[in-house]
């Protein structure tokens, strides 16, 4: 196994913590990538990783992406992530999440956790029994689930990218392939259908497919058909690494914009997409709606602040796409430059809030 320092995904991470609590059945990795702008915020993913090295690879990549995501959103926060090795369908126990909370508490506030793939607001409530450094909890005004905000940000980004690339002012008849029908993917498909898009989708979970077919009347296809079929927009909303040297030559789309993190398997895949004439909208820009939701609720800000923050994603994307076009470089390069400039610069003033 690679050590943290020699791991190919290690990118000057500040802290990488391996957690092993046998009594609680917990094996986890917490990665704090950068706290230049403030405490690291990022979700806790639970997944049945094949081994610890796979978990380490994922958490290192995800935490770096959170640094960029939070910087572009203008937050006084850095990037971090945590992963629990285990099947979320069978391995969840209160003891496991309490142990995870204790591990997070030991970092002294450097990392603030929230839900992610495989975890829920209910799990965050158990984590909160042993740490105060948790966001995305249920309240009187919110169920704690940020996925609708994530889906809305992706939807607005798709609409913006379709306008930019295809010159369309609406989504009527636009063909969108949605990969993944979990909480975010389903909400995205729902928004797309309600705005006239023609949606095909795939998911490894048969129940998710049946629900989407029954409730949204969308066409369910195989993952291979989804990747290779002709469409206007491909929206990856499952796990990362789907855009790679093997899949990119098979894609038949004009735009890529989705909710999945780490959609590019390598940095070279951005160039492959550009050479293929495909407009790739950087994932950490497009899918920031969830962390925007979590951030504003933790700050005690109003729903209007969250709504304004999510809506601003489309404007930010347009700015990135316009600059990329004028400079003859990819949108991912522009987004990375902007994020790194923000990370190197002084911490922002507190985000202005909208009166409730």
Regions inferred by a protein language model and the residue ranges of each:
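Glycine-rich phosphate/diphosphate-binding loop of Rossmann-like nucleotide-binding domains
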Residues: 145-233
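Buried hydrophobic packing segments
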Residues: 59-62, 154-162, 291-295
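N-terminal ligand-binding/catalytic initiation module
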Residues: 1-140
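Flexible, glycine/charged-enriched surface loops at secondary-structure junctions
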Residues: 70-75, 110-115, 166-174, 223, ...
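Adenosine-phosphate binding glycine-rich loop
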Residues: 162, 254-355
């Amino acid at each position: 196994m690679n050590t943290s320092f020699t791991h190919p995904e290690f990118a000057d991470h500040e802290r990488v913590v391996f957690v092993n609590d046998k009594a609680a059945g917990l094996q986890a990795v917490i990665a704090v990538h950068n706290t230049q702008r403030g405490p690291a915020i990022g979700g806790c993913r639970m997944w049945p990783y094949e081994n610890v090295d796979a978990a380490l690879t994922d958490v290192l990549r995800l935490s770096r992406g959170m640094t960029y995501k939070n910087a572009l959103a203008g937050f006084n926060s850095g990037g971090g992530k945590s992963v629990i090795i285990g099947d979320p369908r069978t391995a969840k126990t209160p003891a496991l999440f309490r142990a995870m909370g204790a591990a997070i508490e030991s970092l002294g506030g450097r990392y603030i956790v929230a839900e992610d793939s495989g975890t829920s607001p209910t799990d965050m409530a158990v984590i909160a029994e042993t740490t105060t450094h948790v966001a995305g909890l249920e309240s009187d005004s919110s169920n704690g689930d940020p996925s609708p905000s994530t889906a809305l940000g992706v939807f607005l980004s798709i609409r913006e990218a379709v306008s930019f690339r295809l010159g369309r002012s609406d989504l009527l008849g636009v063909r969108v392939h949605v990969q993944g029908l979990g909480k975010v993917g389903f909400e995205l498909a729902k928004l797309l259908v309600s705005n006239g898009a023609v949606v095909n989708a795939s998911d490894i979970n048969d129940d998710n497919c049946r629900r989407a077919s029954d409730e949204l009347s969308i066409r369910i296809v195989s993952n291979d058909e989804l990747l290779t079929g002709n469409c206007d927009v491909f929206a990856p909303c499952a796990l990362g690494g789907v855009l790679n040297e093997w899949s990119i030559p098979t894609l038949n789309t004009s735009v890529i914009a989705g909710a999945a993190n780490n959609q590019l398997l390598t940095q070279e895949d951005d160039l492959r997409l550009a050479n293929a004439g495909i407009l790739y909208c950087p994932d950490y820009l497009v899918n920031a709606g969830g962390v925007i939701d979590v951030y504003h609720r933790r700050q005690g800000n109003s729903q209007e602040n969250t709504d304004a923050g999510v809506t601003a994603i489309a404007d930010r994307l347009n700015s990135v796409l316009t600059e990329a076009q004028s400079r003859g470089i990819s949108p991912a390069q522009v987004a990375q430059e902007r994020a790194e400039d923000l990370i190197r610069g002084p911490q922002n003033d507190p985000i202005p809030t909208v009166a409730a």
